[in-house]
Amino acid sequence: ILVVSHDVVGDAMAGPGLRYLALARTLAAHVAVTFAIPNPPVARLSAEGFPVVAYRRNDWPTLEPLARASDAILLNTDLATDFPALADLPAALILDAYDPMLSEGRAMVAAHPRDQQIGWWRERMNNLRAQWRMGDFYLCASERQRDWCLGQLESAGRINPLTIAEDPALRGLVDV
């Protein structure tokens, strides 16, 4: 599995970097992991027991060889927007929706003029629609967030009579 962090992983990390390092460590106890990070690996990461490699956001050639060599790819939903070609690969695409950027982003642009807020919102909604259509499985942080994800997936056409007949609880599509 290829685990892709969208945030710096190193000697000083914020929440996302910590989360993806923890996910890579947990998965490495069960499957072969390659960990892709958006910064040069620091020395201490060599002791993790799995390859740690750098890639650049919005630069497909830096991620493509790793993605093509993987059976599954775990990444943040926004990276799916950065790398839409992931949807064309045979690898299972696991999107991590733990960070509800729509809500956070609305707060970040609240002081901007209304037309800028609307422009940001439209772009964000277009990105979200693509993200909810391209994943094979979605992770989230809580049951409440899972409810939000289910609504997003339904509006993207991912939940329908066929998916409900196969998996009435939809845990095979989105889970905590």
Regions found by a protein language model. Give the residues of each.
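Conserved nucleotide-sugar phosphate-binding/catalytic loop shared by glycosyltransferases and other
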Residues: 42-65
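Short N-terminal targeting/anchoring amphipathic segment
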Residues: 64-82, 91-94, 137-139
